[in-house]
Design a protein with these regions (language model features):
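ATP/NTP phosphate-donor binding region
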Residues: 1-96
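C-terminal charged capping/lid subdomain of soluble metabolic enzymes
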Residues: 2, 12, 181-183, 282-355
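A glycine/threonine-rich phosphate-anchoring loop and its flanking beta-alpha core
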Residues: 7, 16, 20, 111, ...
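Residue-level signal for inorganic ion chemistry
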Residues: 18, 39, 75, 126, ...
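Hydrophobic/aromatic beta-strand patches that form the interior of the parallel beta-sheet core
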Residues: 63-65, 98, 123-125, 160-163, ...
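Glycine-rich beta-strand-to-loop/alpha-helix junction loops that act as flexible
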Residues: 69-70, 100-102, 243-244
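Short glycine/serine/threonine-rich phosphate/pyrophosphate-binding segments
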Residues: 104-111, 132, 249-250
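Active-site segments that bind and position negatively charged phosphate/pyrophosphate groups
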Residues: 196, 200-310
């Protein structure tokens, strides 16, 4: 089992990565024996997983709240229902939420924990590749509103993150590829080792080789934990974690979160951002080709031709990275490292959508 850490001071937390079943001792170490526990999960998580988790937690008062699978479930209505459940169960500040599912579950369960009684503890047990490498680490919690994705939320670190590759065996191909989109993101942000791992093991990755999966999850989390520990509230360097997200979120919002998975949308967003980087002179043509080829090598779609700038503009301009009326973009440089800038030619954005 690999143990990593993220956060600072009292909000520092452990991240455990295993290719075996969940370590029972680690889980129960962080749950007070007398505490009530609410497992928030979704309809996509196999019932056997939920049953096994409930049996693993030694507490006598363990409850389950299930939401529907999918991004649309990250709604204000579902958030209210979780709060009502906590109130009905008479939860106190010593009680705990366990987020057991994908990124949607982690976001809404974490946001519920951050706001109920001004904050109760929660544990992340992500069951999708996307949530394992991305949303479970960093303390971002949120719900969606009609005007955009993640516009209502809080930074609130979990007490513990437990990651097992065992859960990835039953993941659909669509969900698996969604997670690979975020893995690719870390390879381009600032992790040459991860980039080399993907280049040399693309076939094993598509075949879900357990050892390679553990390695790419570990490298992805190392990259993210290093960045979020330096910048817990996204006031500086953490913004580079949004590489591809400005355009990916716009695609998701435009299609009402129905057409593409989150990772698939972010993948297209990275292709668009890379093309803008090329037009702005930050990377060479062969580097743009390398980026697109690496993405395609693990079976991810790079064709964004069905999405027009004119259709996405209003969503792009609703982006959280707008400061002082200026849109900040995350681009990539010739060293394959992401950086934030508000200095770019708008025509290069339009051009990137056309090629």
């Amino acid at each position: 089992m690999v143990e990593l850490y993220a956060g600072k001071g009292p909000s520092r937390y452990k991240i455990c990565i295993t290719d075996n079943v969940l370590p029972k001792n680690q889980l129960n170490k962080y749950i007070d024996r007398k505490a009530k526990v609410l497992i928030v999960t979704d309809s996509g998580v196999p019932k056997t997983y939920i049953k096994n988790l409930k049996q693993t937690i030694r507490n006598s008062s363990v409850h389950i709240h299930e939401i529907k699978n999918g991004e649309k479930a990250k709604s204000f209505k579902n958030y209210q229902q979780i709060l009502k459940k906590l109130i009905d169960l008479k939860f106190s500040r010593t009680d705990l939420i366990v987020a057991f599912g994908g990124g949607v579950v982690g976001d809404i369960a974490g946001f519920s924990a951050s706001t109920f009684l001004r904050g109760i503890g929660y544990i992340q047990i992500p069951t999708t590749l996307l949530s394992q490498v991305d949303s479970s680490v960093g303390g971002k919690t949120a719900i969606n509103v009609p005007e955009g994705k993640n516009l209502v939320g809080a930074f609130y670190n979990p007490k513990l993150v437990l990651i097992s590759t065992v859960y990835l065996k039953t993941l659909s191909e669509k969900e698996y590829k969604s997670g690979l989109g975020e893995v690719i993101k870390y390879a381009f942000i600032d992790n040459k080792k991860l980039r080399n791992l993907i280049e040399k093991n693309s076939q094993k990755i598509t075949q879900r080789d357990n050892k390679i999966l553990k390695d790419i999850i570990e490298e992805s989390i190392k990259t993210k934990s290093k960045i979020v520990t330096k910048d817990e509230k996204e006031s500086g360097i953490r913004a580079i974690l949004n590489f591809g997200h400005t355009f990916g979120h716009a695609i998701e919002a435009r299609t009402r979160y129905k057409k593409l998975s989150h990772g698939a949308a972010i993948t297209l967003g990275m292709v668009i951002a890379s093309k803008i980087s090329f037009f702005e002179g930050h990377i060479k043509d062969y580097q743009l080709e390398n980026i697109i080829n690496l993405i395609a090598s693990i079976g991810l779609d790079t064709d964004h031709s069905s999405y027009k700038y004119s259709e996405l503009k209003k969503y792009i301009m609703n982006d959280k990275k707008i400061a002082d009326g200026k849109l900040n973009l995350i681009m990539i440089n010739e060293n394959y490292k992401a950086f934030k800038t508000d200095k770019f030619d708008l025509n290069n954005i339009k051009k990137a959508f056309k090629v």
